[in-house]
Amino acid sequence: SQLMFLQSIISPWLAENLINAYPNVVNDVANGTLKEIDYDLVKGVREFTWNKIKEKIINNYLISDIITMLKPLGVTYTMIKKLLFDEPNPVLLKQQLEDNPYLLTKINGLGFKKVDNLALKLKPEFINSTERLVAFIKYYFTDLGDSKGHTWCSVKILKSAISNNVPECVDKVDWLLENNEFLHIEDDKVGLKYYYDIEMQIYNLLLEKSK
């Protein structure tokens, strides 16, 4: 796990060279027991580079557990920054991710399927959960907005998308449509309340300007 952590903050070959010479380098630097290294033992590292590496280890050490857990997804420190903005405490963030891995759908570029695969490995019991259904619906509408410029669809189309992507959650759809605070439903149209509120703000601003 120390190698995985190092590879997420410095180049993979450099991480391997360091680990080969100092197998416990991450813990030792974080604990303050390793301040200097023998540069002859580590190819490609001199004083300036070593100081930069030490700084990165210390800054990222608190989130090393999270980085190691999410490395199979290709999650980097930069991606985790968005989650840390919402929850700055790494210990609490890790707990939240373990409780509901679908929080990762907040990270741009991961996509629902990648997150879903990891989430079901961490929490197989989430296969037919409300958390999984909510995460898919939020992702579906965000993707719809980004790729096609639409912020809503018919209830029928949404149900079809759910059936095709998270069929195990189908029996929770009707309940969720009636008991949620994140969707706006009008007649047969459904979309994220967040988008609806923004559109209404823009509409009201334009209305005011036209007077």
Question: Over which residues does each language-model region extend?
Answer:
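Long, highly charged, low-complexity intrinsically disordered interaction regions
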Residues: S1-R132, Y139
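Short acidic, hydrophobic short linear motifs in intrinsically disordered regions
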Residues: K148-S163
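ASCE P-loop NTPase motor cores of helicases and related translocases
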Residues: W152, E186-K211
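Charge-enriched amphipathic alpha-helical scaffolds
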Residues: S163-D187
